[in-house]
C-alpha cells in the first residue's frame, strides 16, 4: 500500500503493520473528522502515519477469495496471515460445478453471472477437480512464498495454531466455506 499525505507522512517512510482494504473507509472518515459507524469493519490507518509503533494494532488478518470460476480462475480460498506465517486453504468444486457454490454467478443479471456466461460462451472453463488443499509459508525465510511447508516436519504446531485462528475468524465473521 502506498500513501502520499505530505503534511502527515514523511517521504519514503515505511510501515510494516498489517493493513487491509477494509481499513480505507475508516481512514477516510477519520481524516474527515467523522466517526466510523460501529457496524463498519476495519481500523483507521491514521495512527500509523506518524511512523511510531502502534501498540494496539492487529496481530493477524483474514482474507477470503470466492469468485472462482469467473474472472481469474483462481480457486476459492481463504487464509490467515501473521507477522511470520501465512496459512491458505484452497477448497471447493471445480469448473462449472463451482457455480452452485457461488450465489452470484448463478443469479441472472449480476455482473458475476454476466461474466460467467460470457466466459462459458467461449469455452473458457475447464473441468477442474474439486479441491481441499493447504499451503503454509514462512514469510520471514520465504518472503516470495515459493516453498509450501504445509505438512513438513516441524510445522504441526504452527499449523494447528493457524487453523484455530482461521476457524475463529470464520466463526466471528460468519463465513460459510
Predicted regions and their residues:
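Substrate-binding rim/cap in mid-to-C-terminal beta-strand-loop elements of soluble/periplasmic
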Residues: 1-39, 43-58, 147
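Non-transmembrane alpha-helical segments in soluble domains
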Residues: 2, 25-29, 33, 46-49, ...
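A structural signal for well-ordered alpha-helical segments within the folded catalytic domains
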Residues: 19-26, 40-43, 82, 131-134, ...
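Short, solvent-exposed turn/loop segments enriched in Gly/Ser/Thr/Pro and often Arg
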Residues: 41, 65-67, 173-177
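Cytochrome P450 catalytic domain signature, combining two hallmark sequence patches
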Residues: 56-57, 107, 156-160
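WW-domain-binding short linear motifs
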Residues: 59-64
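C-terminal, low-complexity/hydrophilic appendages and adjacent surface loops
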Residues: 67-151
Amino acid at each position: 500500500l502506498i500513501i502520499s499525505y505530505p503534511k502527515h507522512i514523511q517521504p519514503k517512510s515505511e510501515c510494516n503493520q498489517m493493513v487491509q482494504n477494509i481499513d480505507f473507509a475508516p481512514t477516510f472518515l477519520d481524516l474527515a473528522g467523522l466517526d466510523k459507524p460501529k457496524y463498519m469493519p476495519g481500523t483507521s490507518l491514521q495512527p500509523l502515519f506518524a511512523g511510531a509503533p502502534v501498540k494496539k494494532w492487529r496481530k493477524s488478518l483474514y482474507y477470503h477469495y470466492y469468485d472462482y470460476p469467473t474472472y481469474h480462475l483462481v480457486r476459492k480460498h481463504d487464509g490467515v496471515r501473521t507477522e511470520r506465517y501465512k496459512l491458505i486453504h484452497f477448497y471447493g468444486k471445480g469448473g462449472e460445478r463451482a457455480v452452485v457454490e457461488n450465489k452470484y454467478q448463478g443469479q441472472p443479471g449480476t455482473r458475476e453471472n454476466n461474466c460467467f456466461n460470457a466466459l462459458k460462451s467461449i469455452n473458457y472453463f475447464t473441468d477442474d477437480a474439486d479441491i481441499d488443499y493447504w499451503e503454509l509459508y514462512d514469510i520471514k525465510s520465504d518472503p516470495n512464498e515459493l516453498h509450501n511447508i504445509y505438512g513438513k516436519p516441524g510445522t504441526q504446531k504452527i499449523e494447528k495454531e493457524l487453523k484455530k485462528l482461521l476457524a475463529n475468524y470464520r466463526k466471528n465473521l460468519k463465513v460459510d466455506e
